[in-house]
Amino acid sequence: MSITAERKAEVIKTSATKAGDTGSPEVQVAILSERITNLTAHFKTHTKDNHSRRGLLKLVSTRRSLLDYIKKKDEARYKALLEKHNIRR
């Protein structure tokens, strides 16, 4: 359900705006999207896992807040993120 350190480093590397960038909203959205994808696959086999489902909803809410922040700051970055991570809006 959690992502491995290697996968997280790979996601950070592909989403970073500059070297050493781990905290920008784009990187945070990328990491959250990866975790959400993993949890979604988990729920295909464990349909009654409501405890983890609550965690998924919290991750989605956090990602939504970050996306709203990016949209408020720069619409082009927002649209690029939606396209890159296949996020519905």
UniProtKB/Swiss-Prot annotation:
GO terms for biological process: translation. PROSITE patterns: RIBOSOMAL_S15 (PS00362). It holds the Pfam family Ribosomal_S15. GO terms for cellular component: cytosolic small ribosomal subunit. Residues 1-11 have a biased composition (Basic and acidic residues). It comes from the Bacteria. Residues 1-24 are annotated as: Disordered. NCBIfam families: S15_bact. PANTHER family: RIBOSOMAL PROTEIN S15, BACTERIAL AND ORGANELLAR, SMALL RIBOSOMAL SUBUNIT PROTEIN US15M. One of the primary rRNA binding proteins, it binds directly to 16S rRNA where it helps nucleate assembly of the platform of the 30S subunit by binding and bridging several RNA helices of the 16S rRNA. Part of the 30S ribosomal subunit. Forms a bridge to the 50S subunit in the 70S ribosome, contacting the 23S rRNA. This is Small ribosomal subunit protein uS15. It comes from Rhodopseudomonas palustris (strain ATCC BAA-98 / CGA009). The lineage of its organism: Bacteria, Pseudomonadati, Pseudomonadota, Alphaproteobacteria, Hyphomicrobiales.
